[in-house]
Amino acid sequence: MSYIQNQDKAVYEAIQNEYNRQNNNIELIASENFVSEAVMEAQGSVMTNKYAEGYPGRRYYGGCDYVDVTETIAIERAKALFGAEHVNVQPHSGSQANMAVYLVALEMGDTVLGMNLSHGGHLTHGSPVNFSGKFYNFVDYGVDKETEKIDYEVVRQLAHEHKPKLIVAGTSAYSRQLDFKKFKEIADEVGAKLMVDMAHIAGLVAAGLHPNPVEHADFVTTTTHKTLRGPRGGLILCKEEYKKDIDKTIFPGIQGGPLEHVIAAKAVAFGEALEQDFKVYQEQVIKNAKVLSQTLQEEGFRIVSGGTDNHLLSVDVKNSVNVTGKEAEATLDSIGITCNKNTIPFDQEKAFVTSGIRLGTPTATTRGFDEEAFKEVGRIISLALKNPNNDTKLKEARERVSRLTAKYPLYE
């Protein structure tokens, strides 16, 4: 960091402050993770200098020999991780990966079946404020009011009623396994294609701890961060028959030059995910999520759907301790625990207020937190949210957070 320190003290100070925040706080945002130093080094390498429109072996610029090498490595490693016939590693984000699939599979105004955002879906699955909801006719499916789990018979009924051209299976705040085989059966019944957005669970899928959607879906999209623990970016996996359409939709359709420094970092992350240690890590992520869920339930908190099968859980704080998600987020932030307010199914609060918070275990697990540590995290959360105006209790909670972060330092 010495170059930045000497040249731009304001940016250097902000970066150092962010490092201190990450090191001294417990990160529980489910969509975040800590990349390895090798991934960071690749992303900060000379690959950032190279413009490389096109694909390996077919570039519109000279001097692409070595970015061809790293991009090809990324492609082959992603294929090996997920068993995909074709992979495009160029999407700058998960949203752009989703956009590319929509442009291939749909015409403007076509009907699509996607999960309701407030029930655990994603903005790009048809939210009216997102391009997906503006360009296409999305029909929502959600969770059952009693079980708070997806009712596949309701999904089937909606599919038969609305005859979508595409069904989107994927979530951003759903703590249960998705039945991709059942989604595919429903899609086939109505002649729809199936797209799976596995952004949140890609690491679990890569480790063999969640069913793999690749064998069922026509298209699979994901981010490369979150549980996959790579740089921020996107990825598309598809059947060979869609290769040409997907590739030309990414470039030149919606992107120009790929971010080859990010692709190099993706290659490194995919290599890490192929190691046995990665499976051990993902197993711990799930164990920690289950322990956190159980601890909070023992403390009197209601967990949406009653628990978790993956890396995250949604906590109904409004009906547990009578604070909103917004208030809970602020209280936890004040003691050094970072999370995000989140709507829960059938939420009566506005989206910027919410009745819930979403908690995820990947980031803290990366720095070494085990089940005992997450039991303590659950107790600290309970202490703070039950005493949001008690300075003595909040001071105690902050001190307990500091003991945990000191025990499991970041990047050492």
UniProtKB/Swiss-Prot annotation:
The record marks 225 as: Plays an important role in substrate specificity. The keyword Transferase applies. Coiled coil: none annotated. Its EC number is 2.1.2.1. Its cofactor is pyridoxal 5'-phosphate. (6S)-5,6,7,8-tetrahydrofolate binds at residues 117, 121-123. GO terms for cellular component: cytosol. GO terms for molecular function: glycine hydroxymethyltransferase activity; pyridoxal phosphate binding. This is Serine hydroxymethyltransferase. It comes from Staphylococcus haemolyticus (strain JCSC1435). The modification N6-(pyridoxal phosphate)lysine is found at residue 226. Belongs to the SHMT family. GO terms for biological process: glycine biosynthetic process from serine; tetrahydrofolate interconversion. The keyword Disulfide bond does not apply. Pfam families: SHMT. Catalyzes the reversible interconversion of serine and glycine with tetrahydrofolate (THF) serving as the one-carbon carrier. This reaction serves as the major source of one-carbon groups required for the biosynthesis of purines, thymidylate, methionine, and other important biomolecules. Also exhibits THF-independent aldolase activity toward beta-hydroxyamino acids, producing glycine and aldehydes, via a retro-aldol mechanism. InterPro entries: PyrdxlP-dep_Trfase, PyrdxlP-dep_Trfase_major, PyrdxlP-dep_Trfase_small, Ser_HO-MeTrfase, Ser_HO-MeTrfase-like, Ser_HO-MeTrfase_PLP_BS, SHMT-like_dom. It comes from the Bacteria.
